[in-house]
């Protein structure tokens, strides 16, 4: 492998505006039911009494998630046709001419990255905009973010600059597939496995 690319996700900046998601849908000409990049809204909190005075500790934060181009992708392991594969540059992509549309990859991926396109009759997914990267550009989602909450580059450089946190609630633990992402947590972020909050927009992700 030449270079493993990855995404930096700054949850402290993300306002959940979905500009990245819409820019991706436009650039990739996606159908309404398919979104390669999705915005997770995690929220929770309750009321607590302190000497007869009630206080609330309500919280919410956003995470912009697409395919994480994992080091150990679950999708490639279950693909019976070999359509789902990892390139030399680390991008996990699907060969749409080979895909048989069995959806095993979608069932295996803990992030729901591979998505079935009803119109095309096979699986589709984020490819990291490798065509843009080859031209020295960043993925369209990164370029479109108005709050600069996303960045992209060699994962080793991103980890050196931002640390190696790769999981907060509601994401799964990173050891399952070793996702190539780095997360800067929101002040309200909860650890993976947290039960004090819930996914507030399940139909959108």
UniProtKB/Swiss-Prot annotation:
Keyword Repeat in record: yes
Subunit structure: Heterotrimeric enzyme composed of a catalytic heterodimer (DmsAB) and a membrane anchor protein (DmsC).
Gene3D superfamilies documented for this protein: 3.30.70.20
Gene that this sequence comes from: dmsB
Chain positions recorded as [4Fe-4S] cluster 1 binding sites: 14, 17, 20, 145
InterPro entries: 4Fe4S_Fe-S-bd, 4Fe4S_Fe_S_CS, DMSO_DmsB, ET_IronSulfur_Cluster-Binding
Organism of this sequence: Shigella flexneri
Positions with a binding annotation for [4Fe-4S] cluster 2: 24, 126, 129, 141
Name by which UniProt lists this protein: Anaerobic dimethyl sulfoxide reductase chain B
Residue segments, region Disordered: 184-205
SUPFAM superfamilies noted in UniProt: 4Fe-4S ferredoxins (SSF54862)
4Fe-4S ferredoxin-type domain segment(s): 5-33, 59-89, 90-119
Annotated GO MF terms: 4 iron, 4 sulfur cluster binding; metal ion binding
Biased composition (Polar residues): 186-195
